[in-house]
Amino acid sequence: MAFAKIKVTAQIRLETGLHIGTSNAFAAIGATDSPVIKDPITNLPIIPGSSLKGKMRSLLSKVYNERLAKKPGEDGEILSRLFGNGSDDRYKMGRLIFRDAFFVNKEELDSLGVKSYTEVKFENTIDRITAEANPRQIERAIRNSVFAFELIYEITDESEAQVEEDFKVILDGLKLLELDYLGGSGSRGYG
């Protein structure tokens, strides 16, 4: 029986501020309305593996699915094979493992005089009927932050013949991700 794992590593460098938020249910008065997810040990921003997996799967589904998958289990065979399938009637674990991407260029940014690795962006929405403003504060990882990306691909007997095809899809997904945005507010220049 063949069994192996292939580790794919890369770096994600932010071209713009990135917001992947967390709950602010217990925020103190005056705190940021929407903080970013941070590593509890270093207090530095991270990119959750679930965000990378979800965004990549979503982008690939537009290319590889015959129609938009509205529920678990409606993805085509290749995406189900790579990302898994949560459908009750045909549950299947995927071949890919996405690790959390940790912030790795603290020293580089320190040498440039950076004092904080996140920024708070003030935004405002205006009610179209009442013209009432709704200001809010959104925390973002700053541009030029670098995160260590790691993806694990599992090879088994059943997948051995499909490795080349799978990696073509993975590379397509990485390219699509590079050309799109990650996190919230992408249409407003984030991520």
For the regions a language model picked out, list residue spans one by one.
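RNA-binding basic/glycine-rich loop and surface signature characteristic of RAMP-family CRISPR effectors
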Residues: M1-I126, T130-G191
